[in-house]
Swiss-Prot record:
Signal peptide: none annotated. A motif ('HIGH' region) lies at residues 59-68. GO terms for cellular component: cytosol. ATP binds at residue 249. Its main location: cytoplasm. It catalyses: tRNA(Tyr) + L-tyrosine + ATP = L-tyrosyl-tRNA(Tyr) + AMP + diphosphate + H(+). PROSITE patterns: S4. It is found in: Cytoplasm. Belongs to the class-I aminoacyl-tRNA synthetase family. TyrS type 2 subfamily. Gene3D superfamilies: HUPs, RNA-binding S4 domain, Tyrosyl-Transfer RNA Synthetase. The keyword Kinase does not apply. This is Tyrosine--tRNA ligase. Homodimer.
Amino acid sequence: MEPTSRTFPTAVSSAQGDPRIAEITQRGVAEVFPGGAAALAERLATTDRPLRVKLGIDPTRPDLHLGHAVVLRKLRQFQDAGHVAILLIGDFTALVGDPTGQSEARPRLTPAEVEENARTYLEQAGKILDFETPGRLEVRRNSEWLARLTLSELIELQAQMTVGQMLAKEDFAQRYRSGTPIYLHEFLYPLLQGYDSVALEADVELGGTDQRFNLLVGRELQLWKGQTPQFCLTVPLLEGLDGYQKMSKSKNNYVGLTEDPLTMYSKLEKVPDQLVERYFELLTSVPPSELPADPRQRQILLAKTLVAQFHSSEAAEEAQRTAQALVLQGNLVETGSIPTFAIQCLSYPVKLSYILRESGLCKSAAEARRQIQGGAVRLDGQKVEDPDLEFAQASELDGRVLQVGKKAFCRLVVGTN
């Protein structure tokens, strides 16, 4: 895919005046090497062509979460500044398994698992990256070149690093000291990731702070092949909702990119106080000067901002109203635990008493009417008073929370056969 033509600044001083360059090189950045943020800013300001900016993601799990969004947003910033984002799906390296941060070897995935995960990754990355503007994005798979390496080429690649250099990687060093097995295929991983930069002729590579070693290997291999070595930009690892561990689905401290607005809002409005500013910095473009002084209002703004970002402003407003409505008698209902009821193939108008019966919240339509008359039924937290209440169309029901008494809830979802 050829990059679109574009006029770039020619003076280094423009780096100081271009807010896009400042955002790329400073906001939400842990480290830039070599030369720091100033060196990358100068390169961005003086380049006469779009830079090729690489981000590799191994599809080891089926879904993305906000931890992945941090580096994807950084890649989007390069896109918005006119550069070429390369989203590299590590379909080959996922079969090897990245040893970074692992106290033991990763379980091996099957090609079918990797392919299915890759499919969902691409769908979800579209919530952040620009997939529409011609020339702004290349989606590549490293099996394109890694699967074709011959044995002699692989030996030559391995000859570029020593065992001592590999053991300088902290994860390997800890396992070596503790006597935990290190398998030979794991030593290959940094070399394969580095070779990706050679194959793509990357100018910049992005990654989390835990990827520093692998990014540096990419620079060394580019030098070996006579290429100009890439800049490396790392972003912080996002702490999860527990407040201290890295966000991870396995730790159940995550917010998924595809979670519904109400669940996403309800999780985010409870982000620990000490992490709210960090979430704003890494996941939004809201300036620090615009953050409310009140800690609770900061949490609410964070939740609304991110729901709007991944869904819509309307969805964020509705999620806030519903979440507030679910604060009943001082007890917050955990919205993530509310079951859903799929309303399928109903003819409209439909009575609320029918839905109460079909959802199982009431045993019969007669009981449903009695519960309504007794003031026990609420819709999005608002008491329902009319036992004959009807809904004319599906949109009046979809996504709303129906409640009977203090503990019986369901979220209504309009489905189809």
